[in-house]
Amino acid sequence: MPPTINMGIPGASSSVTGGVSGKRVLLAEPRGYCAGVDRAVETVERALEKHGAPVYVRHEIVHNRYVVDTLAKAGAVFVEQTDEVPEGAIVVFSAHGVAPTVHVEAAARNLKTIDATCPLVTKVHNEAKRFARDDYDILLVGHEGHEEVVGTAGEAPDHVQVVDNPDAVDKVTVRDPDKVIWLSQTTLSVDETMETVRRLREKFPTLQDPPSDDICYATQNRQVAVKAMAPECELVIVVGSKNSSNSVRLVEVALGAGSDAAHLVDYAEDIDPTWLDGVTTVGVTSGASVPEVLVRGVLDRLAEYGYGTVQPVTTANETLVFALPREIRPARS
C-alpha cells in the first residue's frame, strides 16, 4: 500500500507529491458520508425494520440517487409534498429539514413523523428563529429553491432574504443596516460564501456573523482535501449526484484549486474514457451523501485503465456521530 500523504494534521507533510511515477490515483480523505447523512439513512432503515413498508419520506432523504433507489427497493416511498402521504401514515423528514408549516400539515393529517433533519441544519433553523425574535434582517446565503434553504427561510419568512451568490448582493435591501446578520446553507463553497459575505459587509459594515460556523464541518473538510490534491491532478472525479449541492461544490473547488478538469459521476459507468487521455494523476473524492461502495466502484474502473496505484491524501480525521431520532432509537435493555 503506498504511503498515506497527510496534510493539515500535526506532523503532516505539506506536499502531495508521493514520489510514485506512472499512473496513480490520489484519494481524498475525508470523503463520503458525513454524520448527518449517516444518521438520516439509518433513520429510514430503522423505521422500515420497526414499522415495515411502506415508510414515506418527504423529499429525497439525502441527495444521492443510489441511496434513494436502494431505500425505495426496501420499501421507502419518496414524496414531494406532505399531502401525498396517506392520513395516519409514517413520514420521515429528510436531512435537509422542513419549514414549520410542514409540521403543521403533518399534524393536520395525523401523520406519525420522524424528523431526520441534520442537527447542524437544525442549528441554523434555531439561529433564524432567535434572530427573527430580535427583529433582525436575516441574510441567508444559499441556493434559492434548495430544500435546506426553503426549510430555514420558512422559520422566519418575514425576516429572511436569500442571497444566492456574490452578484446578488447588489439587490439586497434591509430595514435597519445596524441590525443585520448573515446565516448560510450548510453545504456551500466556503470560498464563494466568504466572498458573498465580504460584499455584504462592504454594503452593511455592521453585519453580524452567525454565533458559530453554519457551513458544516464535513463540507469544509471535503473541500480542504480536494484543495490539497487538485494541484497535482490533471483530472478530479467527484462521486455524487447532480442535485447534491456539496458534491457540485467539490467539482468547482477542484477546478479552482488547479485541476485541469473535474467531473461529477453517480457511478463508475459514467466515467468517459476520453477524460483519461494523457492523464497521469486522477484525484477521487465523493460528496457527503455518497456511500463508499460507489467510490470503490470508481477505483476499480480506474484500475482497469491502469490507475492501480492509490495514494490517500488525508487532511482531517472525522469521528462525529449523531444520535438517532428518539422515535427509532433501540430500546434500552
From Swiss-Prot:
Does the keyword S-adenosyl-L-methionine belong to this entry?
Answer: no
HAMAP family, per this entry?
A: IspH
Give the required cofactors: [4Fe-4S] cluster
**Catalytic site residues?**
148 (proton donor)
Q: Which reaction does it catalyse?
A: isopentenyl diphosphate + 2 oxidized [2Fe-2S]-[ferredoxin] + H2O = (2E)-4-hydroxy-3-methylbut-2-enyl diphosphate + 2 reduced [2Fe-2S]-[ferredoxin] + 2 H(+); dimethylallyl diphosphate + 2 oxidized [2Fe-2S]-[ferredoxin] + H2O = (2E)-4-hydroxy-3-methylbut-2-enyl diphosphate + 2 reduced [2Fe-2S]-[ferredoxin] + 2 H(+)
For the ligand (dimethylallyl diphosphate), the binding residues are 63, 96, 146, 244-246, 289
Q: What is its EC number?
A: 1.17.7.4
Answer yes or no on keyword rRNA-binding: no
Q: Which organism is it from?
A: Mycobacterium sp. (strain JLS)
The organism's place on the tree of life at top rank: Bacteria
Family statement: Belongs to the IspH family.
Q: What's one Pfam family here?
A: LYTB
What the protein does comes down to: Catalyzes the conversion of 1-hydroxy-2-methyl-2-(E)-butenyl 4-diphosphate (HMBPP) into a mixture of isopentenyl diphosphate (IPP) and dimethylallyl diphosphate (DMAPP). Acts in the terminal step of the DOXP/MEP pathway for isoprenoid precursor biosynthesis.
Q: MF terms per GO, please?
A: 4 iron, 4 sulfur cluster binding; 4-hydroxy-3-methylbut-2-enyl diphosphate reductase activity; metal ion binding
Q: Which residues bind (2E)-4-hydroxy-3-methylbut-2-enyl diphosphate?
A: 63, 96, 146, 186, 244-246, 289
* One of the GO BP terms on file: isopentenyl diphosphate biosynthetic process, methylerythritol 4-phosphate pathway
Q: What enzyme category does the UniProt record give?
A: oxidoreductase
The residues the record assigns to binding [4Fe-4S] cluster are 34, 118, 216
Q: What is the lineage of its organism?
A: Bacteria, Bacillati, Actinomycetota, Actinomycetes, Mycobacteriales
Q: How is the cofactor bound?
A: Binds 1 [4Fe-4S] cluster per subunit.
Entry-linked InterPro entries: LytB/IspH
> Which gene produces this protein?
ispH
The entry marks the following residues as binding isopentenyl diphosphate, namely 63, 96, 146, 244-246, 289
Q: Which key words tag this protein in UniProt?
A: 4Fe-4S, Iron, Iron-sulfur, Isoprene biosynthesis, Metal-binding, Oxidoreductase
Pathway named in the protein's UniProt entry: Isoprenoid biosynthesis; dimethylallyl diphosphate biosynthesis; dimethylallyl diphosphate from (2E)-4-hydroxy-3-methylbutenyl diphosphate: step 1/1; Isoprenoid biosynthesis; isopentenyl diphosphate biosynthesis via DXP pathway; isopentenyl diphosphate from 1-deoxy-D-xylulose 5-phosphate: step 6/6
Q: What name has this protein been given in UniProt? A: 4-hydroxy-3-methylbut-2-enyl diphosphate reductase
